[in-house]
């Protein structure tokens, strides 16, 4: 075993593994190089990835470094700005780029040429004057249209940016940050462990089998769900997450923050927070706490739920004037109104009005919000995706209402809006709500499954379960019941053996399918084992439990058990309080880890959204118990 010298800015995941495999390894700070007897070591690791910037070796140390290279001893450099005669004039930001194992001259055990690795929000030294004939081990590529493997020789990939490569016979160069691969949650974990094991073996000059650190996110893969009450632990963890992750603003008095974005720093694993306050997230989060109060009598949960409901209607709704009833999108987007976001914000209010004795203090406010949305709803019952107040002139408003102007047939934009019209009608709202909702869902279902799609075909199906359940509940029409079963049965085609639902998009027609530089689907190719807990699977616990309440068909109870079981098994368990109890957007159901195509501008696989994901899942996990208690 080689004796290894480590120069770095303190401990890291990689330095800890080096110390583990080599008990004589020693760690020094870069600035302490003068006290080191370099000749006393057999191998050297220069780790700059945990520093603020790419490391530039001081000239005296650089001279020593180049002399060491001449000895033939193994040297590994990580995020060092200049090596040999190569220097990096540009440090590239890597956000939507992933790495491909090229498999040319240097074999990494456990990897196959074309395997894909995600180094998250990274930095990469782009060295000038590298030979075009360089056969890099790992190369960075932008927007790879594949889940976890691709053809490395595909012409469209191009040469890529070298990320791991050999300089001469004895210097292994990592252009990127990778020393904190574990705390930065590089994925897939198995692929990265192969790479790290290769680096360790290179320095040790013999094969090694390190004990890798515990993953920051673990899962209870073998948890069993036999009854609705078996979700209690997951619900407790999920509700507690809002507190420990500091998402509630003044206990909900001023809303809830949007969540955690996908951007995880490769330097130290810090995950970026999204601090916008969204009305929909606030309403959905309030719904999760409301259901806890209804189930357990927890007065603290009731207080938070009331705070969030008050916030939505007291601060985020126009109370008078030309736009009376309008519910704002966010604390920043004061004049933008999305009907789908409004629908989800008022969902807890309408459930409370329908299924509790005391009802909701804000039922009329919710009705006003829906009345405002009707003003730009066409004769077919559908709306344009959003309303921008500065552009909504009386002329444009009339055009929407009279001619189906710019409407969309996406369930993503319209189905929950129609469901809320139905719930409001059921609780005493105007008959017009029923008429518009029936027309809207009929328009969509007459086109289904060829209606427009947002992220995937799977999402459109998941989005329809709750609205079609409410539609059948209100009308009792056999045709509407058949629609519900049709969509539910279609969903079975994309259900994974674990109970989750794979993303699927026949013909890749969705607006966000294979997109770049915007909102993007997690799906690369149909058949990828990826579940989307932001746009698809997250809607199903509430949808299936409502369908069971309406039909009393054990089929829907079983579908709820399957998806709820999947969700308690893929909930994050972590020593990090900002992660423990959360669900992330993307989940690979074969690898059983958070992973997927990271092309979305901010809401890629590792993101955690307070409303769409956390609030909706927690409501859905609890609602079945309320159904059993005959709400």
Residue ranges and their predicted role:
Residues 67, 191-198, 215-217, 223-245, ...:
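Extended, well-ordered alpha-helical scaffold segments
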Residues 217-228, 283-299, 344-361, 415-431, ...:
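Well-ordered alpha-helical scaffold segments within catalytic/enzyme domains
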Residues 146-236:
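Extracellular ligand-binding/catalytic regions of CAZymes and related secreted enzymes
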